[in-house]
Amino acid sequence: MDYLVKALAYDGKVRAYAANTTDTINEAQRRHHTWPTASAAIGRTMTATVMMGAMLKGENKLTVKIEGGGPIGAIIADGNAKGQVRGYVSNPQVHFDLNEHGKLDVRRAVGTSGTLSVVKDIGLKDHFTGQTEIVSGEIGDDFTYYLVSSEQVPSSVGVGVLVNPDNSILAAGGFIIQLLPGTEDAVIERLEKRLSTIEPISKLIEKGMTPEEILEEVLGEKPQILETVPVEFSCNCSKERFANGIISLGKAEIDDMIEQDGQAEAQCHFCNETYVFTKEELEELREEITR
Protein backbone atom coordinates (compact mmCIF):
# COMPACT_ATOMS: atom_id res chain seq x y z
CA MET A 1 0.00 0.00 0.00
CA ASP A 2 1.31 3.44 -0.92
CA TYR A 3 1.73 6.03 1.81
CA LEU A 4 3.67 9.13 2.76
CA VAL A 5 5.14 10.31 6.03
CA LYS A 6 5.59 13.80 7.44
CA ALA A 7 8.49 14.20 9.84
CA LEU A 8 10.80 16.56 11.72
CA ALA A 9 14.52 16.11 12.35
CA TYR A 10 17.49 17.92 13.89
CA ASP A 11 15.55 19.29 16.87
CA GLY A 12 12.65 20.45 14.73
CA LYS A 13 14.83 22.51 12.40
CA VAL A 14 14.32 20.24 9.37
CA ARG A 15 10.92 19.31 7.93
CA ALA A 16 10.76 16.19 5.78
CA TYR A 17 8.34 14.21 3.63
CA ALA A 18 8.80 10.86 1.92
CA ALA A 19 6.41 8.72 -0.12
CA ASN A 20 6.15 5.37 -1.83
CA THR A 21 3.85 5.92 -4.82
CA THR A 22 4.48 2.73 -6.82
CA ASP A 23 0.85 1.49 -6.92
CA THR A 24 -0.47 5.02 -7.52
CA ILE A 25 1.78 5.62 -10.54
CA ASN A 26 1.05 2.10 -11.78
CA GLU A 27 -2.64 3.03 -11.79
CA ALA A 28 -1.87 6.22 -13.74
CA GLN A 29 0.15 4.17 -16.26
CA ARG A 30 -2.67 1.62 -16.60
CA ARG A 31 -5.29 4.31 -17.19
CA HIS A 32 -3.28 6.47 -19.59
CA HIS A 33 -1.21 3.72 -21.33
CA THR A 34 1.92 5.83 -20.93
CA TRP A 35 5.21 4.70 -22.44
CA PRO A 36 8.24 4.52 -20.09
CA THR A 37 9.63 8.06 -20.47
CA ALA A 38 6.15 9.56 -20.16
CA SER A 39 5.49 7.30 -17.14
CA ALA A 40 8.62 8.64 -15.44
CA ALA A 41 7.59 12.25 -16.15
CA ILE A 42 4.03 11.93 -14.90
CA GLY A 43 5.14 9.68 -12.02
CA ARG A 44 7.73 12.15 -10.77
CA THR A 45 5.23 15.01 -11.08
CA MET A 46 2.41 13.18 -9.26
CA THR A 47 4.81 12.09 -6.50
CA ALA A 48 6.02 15.64 -5.87
CA THR A 49 2.41 16.88 -6.05
CA VAL A 50 1.12 14.42 -3.44
CA MET A 51 3.95 15.40 -1.05
CA MET A 52 3.17 19.10 -1.58
CA GLY A 53 -0.47 18.23 -0.92
CA ALA A 54 0.66 16.90 2.47
CA MET A 55 1.82 20.43 3.31
CA LEU A 56 -1.82 21.58 3.07
CA LYS A 57 -4.62 21.16 5.61
CA GLY A 58 -8.24 19.99 5.62
CA GLU A 59 -10.03 20.29 2.29
CA ASN A 60 -7.28 22.35 0.66
CA LYS A 61 -5.93 21.19 -2.69
CA LEU A 62 -3.42 22.13 -5.38
CA THR A 63 -2.86 21.77 -9.10
CA VAL A 64 0.58 21.53 -10.69
CA LYS A 65 1.15 22.21 -14.38
CA ILE A 66 4.48 21.65 -16.12
CA GLU A 67 4.98 22.93 -19.65
CA GLY A 68 8.58 22.60 -20.78
CA GLY A 69 8.10 22.80 -24.54
CA GLY A 70 9.04 19.14 -25.10
CA PRO A 71 7.21 16.43 -27.09
CA ILE A 72 5.31 15.23 -24.03
CA GLY A 73 3.30 18.48 -23.94
CA ALA A 74 1.78 19.54 -20.62
CA ILE A 75 1.82 17.48 -17.43
CA ILE A 76 -1.05 18.23 -15.04
CA ALA A 77 -1.45 16.82 -11.52
CA ASP A 78 -3.97 17.48 -8.75
CA GLY A 79 -3.25 16.66 -5.11
CA ASN A 80 -4.80 17.30 -1.70
CA ALA A 81 -4.08 17.02 2.01
CA LYS A 82 -5.60 13.51 2.15
CA GLY A 83 -2.98 11.78 0.00
CA GLN A 84 -5.22 11.69 -3.07
CA VAL A 85 -3.61 12.51 -6.40
CA ARG A 86 -4.47 12.28 -10.08
CA GLY A 87 -2.66 13.35 -13.22
CA TYR A 88 -2.32 13.17 -16.96
CA VAL A 89 0.05 14.11 -19.73
CA SER A 90 -0.85 15.60 -23.14
CA ASN A 91 1.09 12.97 -25.12
CA PRO A 92 1.32 9.70 -23.17
CA GLN A 93 3.01 7.73 -25.97
CA VAL A 94 6.44 9.36 -25.68
CA HIS A 95 9.61 7.33 -25.14
CA PHE A 96 13.32 7.86 -25.82
CA ASP A 97 16.47 5.82 -25.40
CA LEU A 98 18.12 6.06 -21.98
CA ASN A 99 20.26 9.16 -21.37
CA GLU A 100 24.02 9.18 -20.79
CA HIS A 101 23.45 8.29 -17.12
CA GLY A 102 21.47 5.17 -18.07
CA LYS A 103 18.21 6.74 -16.90
CA LEU A 104 14.92 7.49 -18.63
CA ASP A 105 15.41 10.72 -20.59
CA VAL A 106 12.72 12.77 -18.87
CA ARG A 107 14.44 16.07 -19.68
CA ARG A 108 14.18 15.39 -23.42
CA ALA A 109 10.50 14.51 -23.11
CA VAL A 110 9.55 17.45 -20.87
CA GLY A 111 11.75 20.10 -22.47
CA THR A 112 13.74 22.85 -20.78
CA SER A 113 12.05 26.08 -21.86
CA GLY A 114 8.79 26.74 -20.07
CA THR A 115 7.21 26.95 -16.65
CA LEU A 116 6.15 25.01 -13.58
CA SER A 117 3.04 26.55 -12.06
CA VAL A 118 1.24 25.72 -8.84
CA VAL A 119 -2.31 26.82 -8.01
CA LYS A 120 -3.40 26.27 -4.40
CA ASP A 121 -7.05 26.29 -3.37
CA ILE A 122 -6.90 27.02 0.35
CA GLY A 123 -10.56 27.89 0.80
CA LEU A 124 -10.24 31.61 0.13
CA LYS A 125 -11.92 33.60 -2.64
CA ASP A 126 -8.66 33.98 -4.54
CA HIS A 127 -6.37 31.03 -5.17
CA PHE A 128 -2.63 31.24 -4.49
CA THR A 129 -0.66 30.96 -7.74
CA GLY A 130 3.10 30.55 -8.03
CA GLN A 131 5.14 30.05 -11.17
CA THR A 132 8.82 29.48 -11.89
CA GLU A 133 10.85 28.68 -14.98
CA ILE A 134 11.80 25.11 -15.81
CA VAL A 135 15.46 24.80 -14.80
CA SER A 136 16.28 21.22 -15.83
CA GLY A 137 13.24 19.33 -17.13
CA GLU A 138 14.10 16.47 -14.76
CA ILE A 139 11.13 17.41 -12.52
CA GLY A 140 12.81 17.03 -9.10
CA ASP A 141 15.18 19.95 -9.70
CA ASP A 142 12.27 21.99 -11.05
CA PHE A 143 10.20 21.44 -7.90
CA THR A 144 13.26 22.29 -5.78
CA TYR A 145 13.65 25.57 -7.68
CA TYR A 146 9.93 26.31 -7.31
CA LEU A 147 9.93 25.80 -3.52
CA VAL A 148 13.08 27.88 -3.06
CA SER A 149 12.09 30.70 -5.44
CA SER A 150 8.32 30.94 -5.15
CA GLU A 151 7.74 29.81 -1.56
CA GLN A 152 11.11 30.96 -0.16
CA VAL A 153 11.79 27.67 1.63
CA PRO A 154 15.27 26.11 1.20
CA SER A 155 14.35 22.64 -0.08
CA SER A 156 15.61 19.54 -1.81
CA VAL A 157 13.21 17.40 -3.84
CA GLY A 158 14.06 13.88 -4.99
CA VAL A 159 11.57 11.94 -7.13
CA GLY A 160 12.07 8.79 -9.18
CA VAL A 161 10.30 6.11 -11.21
CA LEU A 162 11.54 2.74 -12.47
CA VAL A 163 9.59 1.06 -15.29
CA ASN A 164 9.30 -2.69 -15.99
CA PRO A 165 9.86 -4.14 -19.50
CA ASP A 166 6.06 -4.57 -19.82
CA ASN A 167 5.60 -0.79 -19.13
CA SER A 168 4.19 -1.34 -15.64
CA ILE A 169 5.81 0.51 -12.74
CA LEU A 170 8.54 -1.27 -10.75
CA ALA A 171 9.14 1.48 -8.19
CA ALA A 172 8.11 5.09 -7.65
CA GLY A 173 8.48 7.56 -4.82
CA GLY A 174 10.20 10.62 -3.51
CA PHE A 175 11.24 12.89 -0.68
CA ILE A 176 11.19 16.59 0.15
CA ILE A 177 13.61 18.00 2.73
CA GLN A 178 13.03 21.58 3.93
CA LEU A 179 15.18 23.76 6.18
CA LEU A 180 13.31 25.84 8.72
CA PRO A 181 14.63 29.21 9.95
CA GLY A 182 17.62 28.92 12.26
CA THR A 183 19.09 25.68 10.91
CA GLU A 184 22.78 25.54 11.87
CA ASP A 185 25.44 25.53 9.13
CA ALA A 186 26.77 22.18 10.36
CA VAL A 187 23.36 20.57 9.79
CA ILE A 188 23.08 22.13 6.33
CA GLU A 189 26.55 20.85 5.39
CA ARG A 190 25.73 17.37 6.66
CA LEU A 191 22.49 17.24 4.67
CA GLU A 192 24.16 18.54 1.51
CA LYS A 193 26.81 15.83 1.82
CA ARG A 194 24.24 13.08 2.31
CA LEU A 195 22.05 14.32 -0.55
CA SER A 196 25.04 14.26 -2.90
CA THR A 197 25.93 10.65 -2.07
CA ILE A 198 22.63 8.76 -1.65
CA GLU A 199 21.40 6.35 -4.30
CA PRO A 200 18.52 7.42 -6.57
CA ILE A 201 15.22 7.38 -4.68
CA SER A 202 13.69 4.84 -7.09
CA LYS A 203 16.54 2.42 -6.29
CA LEU A 204 15.90 2.78 -2.55
CA ILE A 205 12.23 1.92 -3.10
CA GLU A 206 13.13 -0.98 -5.38
CA LYS A 207 15.28 -2.32 -2.51
CA GLY A 208 12.15 -2.34 -0.36
CA MET A 209 12.95 0.65 1.84
CA THR A 210 9.95 2.28 3.52
CA PRO A 211 9.37 6.05 3.50
CA GLU A 212 10.57 6.12 7.13
CA GLU A 213 13.80 4.30 6.20
CA ILE A 214 14.32 6.56 3.19
CA LEU A 215 14.14 9.65 5.41
CA GLU A 216 16.62 8.13 7.84
CA GLU A 217 18.95 7.40 4.91
CA VAL A 218 18.63 10.93 3.53
CA LEU A 219 18.75 12.79 6.86
CA GLY A 220 21.43 10.75 8.58
CA GLU A 221 19.34 10.45 11.74
CA LYS A 222 16.07 8.88 12.80
CA PRO A 223 13.34 11.49 12.22
CA GLN A 224 10.33 12.13 14.42
CA ILE A 225 7.34 10.89 12.39
CA LEU A 226 4.42 13.31 12.78
CA GLU A 227 1.86 11.69 10.52
CA THR A 228 1.36 8.81 8.09
CA VAL A 229 -1.05 9.36 5.19
CA PRO A 230 -2.25 6.69 2.71
CA VAL A 231 -1.61 7.67 -0.92
CA GLU A 232 -3.87 6.70 -3.83
CA PHE A 233 -4.80 7.60 -7.39
CA SER A 234 -8.20 9.22 -6.94
CA CYS A 235 -10.41 11.09 -9.38
CA ASN A 236 -13.57 12.94 -8.38
CA CYS A 237 -15.15 12.91 -11.84
CA SER A 238 -18.69 11.54 -12.18
CA LYS A 239 -21.45 11.14 -14.75
CA GLU A 240 -23.44 13.79 -12.89
CA ARG A 241 -20.63 16.34 -13.32
CA PHE A 242 -20.43 15.68 -17.04
CA ALA A 243 -24.24 15.87 -17.25
CA ASN A 244 -24.07 19.37 -15.76
CA GLY A 245 -21.41 20.19 -18.34
CA ILE A 246 -23.69 19.04 -21.17
CA ILE A 247 -26.59 21.09 -19.77
CA SER A 248 -24.35 24.17 -19.74
CA LEU A 249 -23.80 23.76 -23.52
CA GLY A 250 -27.42 24.71 -24.12
CA LYS A 251 -30.47 23.27 -25.89
CA ALA A 252 -29.26 23.76 -29.49
CA GLU A 253 -26.00 21.88 -28.83
CA ILE A 254 -27.86 18.98 -27.19
CA ASP A 255 -30.28 18.89 -30.16
CA ASP A 256 -27.26 18.49 -32.46
CA MET A 257 -25.92 15.60 -30.37
CA ILE A 258 -29.27 13.82 -30.51
CA GLU A 259 -29.77 14.36 -34.26
CA GLN A 260 -26.21 13.68 -35.44
CA ASP A 261 -24.95 10.93 -33.13
CA GLY A 262 -27.97 9.77 -31.14
CA GLN A 263 -25.72 9.79 -28.07
CA ALA A 264 -22.78 11.61 -26.46
CA GLU A 265 -19.49 10.45 -25.01
CA ALA A 266 -17.47 12.39 -22.44
CA GLN A 267 -14.00 11.39 -21.29
CA CYS A 268 -12.20 12.57 -18.17
CA HIS A 269 -8.66 13.80 -18.92
CA PHE A 270 -7.42 12.84 -15.48
CA CYS A 271 -8.52 9.20 -15.27
CA ASN A 272 -9.57 8.31 -18.85
CA GLU A 273 -12.99 7.17 -17.63
CA THR A 274 -15.58 7.42 -20.42
CA TYR A 275 -19.22 8.31 -19.73
CA VAL A 276 -21.85 7.53 -22.37
CA PHE A 277 -25.13 9.45 -22.51
CA THR A 278 -27.89 7.69 -24.46
CA LYS A 279 -30.43 9.50 -26.62
CA GLU A 280 -32.97 9.17 -23.80
CA GLU A 281 -30.55 10.63 -21.25
CA LEU A 282 -29.75 13.55 -23.56
CA GLU A 283 -33.47 14.21 -24.00
CA GLU A 284 -33.87 14.26 -20.21
CA LEU A 285 -31.00 16.77 -19.90
CA ARG A 286 -32.63 18.92 -22.58
CA GLU A 287 -35.88 18.78 -20.63
CA GLU A 288 -34.07 20.10 -17.54
CA ILE A 289 -33.13 23.24 -19.49
CA THR A 290 -36.71 23.94 -20.56
CA ARG A 291 -38.21 23.28 -17.12
Curated annotation (Swiss-Prot):
PTM summary: Under oxidizing conditions two disulfide bonds are formed involving the reactive cysteines. Under reducing conditions zinc is bound to the reactive cysteines and the protein is inactive.
Pfam families in UniProt: HSP33
Domain of life: Bacteria
Keyword Cell cycle tagged: no
Signal peptide bounds: none
GO molecular function (one): unfolded protein binding
Keyword terms: Chaperone, Cytoplasm, Disulfide bond, Redox-active center, Zinc
Subcellular location: Cytoplasm
Keyword Chaperone in annotation: yes
GO terms (BP aspect): protein refolding
GO CC aspect terms: cytoplasm
Disulfide bonds: 235-237, 268-271
InterPro entries, A to Z: Heat_shock_Hsp33, Heat_shock_Hsp33_C, Heat_shock_Hsp33_N
Family: Belongs to the HSP33 family.
NCBIfam families, alphabetized: PRK00114.1 (NF001033)
Task of the protein: Redox regulated molecular chaperone. Protects both thermally unfolding and oxidatively damaged proteins from irreversible aggregation. Plays an important role in the bacterial defense system toward oxidative stress.
HAMAP family: HslO
Name the UniProt record assigns to this protein: 33 kDa chaperonin
Natural source organism: Bacillus pumilus (strain SAFR-032)
